[in-house]
Amino acid sequence: VTLTPYLGLIKGGLAGAQYLLRGTGPATSQGVEAGAFWGPDKNSSLPEWQAHLIVALRNPPPNERIAHGFAIRVCQLQPKSRGTLRLRSADPSDTPAIDPRFLSDESDFISMQEGVRQLCEIIDQPGLGKFVKRKIDIDAFTSVASRKKWIRERAETIYHPVGTCRMGEDSNAVVDDQLRVRGIDNLRVIDGSIMPTVISGNTNLPIMAMAEKAAELIAEGNETRAVLVGRRCP
């Protein structure tokens, strides 16, 4: 049983109501029930790909009635492509111009192709393969251009952007090791933007750890100021 039947408006709405009223039912699932991390070989020090097992078939083949289905997707963890974030105007209320420049580095295409290829090998294992009706064969595309086209048309973000306010000691670093913005008093940045590069995994837990550390730094700073003020008092 999967969430595929509940992607429609009626069944999805009923499942949502059941969850809100009773805290039970299909909507208690967050959709991605399993995952895996792996590298190019067993000696890899860091994973290069992450797989997500999604308990729903979001885009079933046309003209096919599918009662249940699941999907497994691969994610490249260390892309080399770099995007930009620029001011759109001098108006502080104006939204910034964000260009992620996905797949602008050739090596990302190579990594994505290999990630899909290795994921198919995992799917072919006896414990899982018997449940899979259809999978993508990246080698069935006869040219590099066709493989690139297929990847570009289907690739999506998983919303782990980092690095726009990176920490460091060089002149291009935005914050120092105390999370303080260089050149501006009493301003810290505490989120994923301070990471110099994206990590090989999900960003939520590291950001929570950063926030806890930042709270300690701010509290320590307040205590120091309180002591200094106290010394000045008669």
Go through each PLM region and give its residues.
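Mid-to-C-terminal "cap/lid" subdomains and adjacent gly/pro-rich loops that border
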Residues: 1-66, 121-126, 144, 153, ...
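C-terminal structured subdomain/cap of oxidoreductase catalytic cores
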Residues: 1-2, 41, 70-128, 148-234
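Short acidic alpha-helical/loop segments enriched in Asp/Glu that coordinate divalent cations
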Residues: 128-140
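An alpha-helix initiation/capping motif
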Residues: 137-149
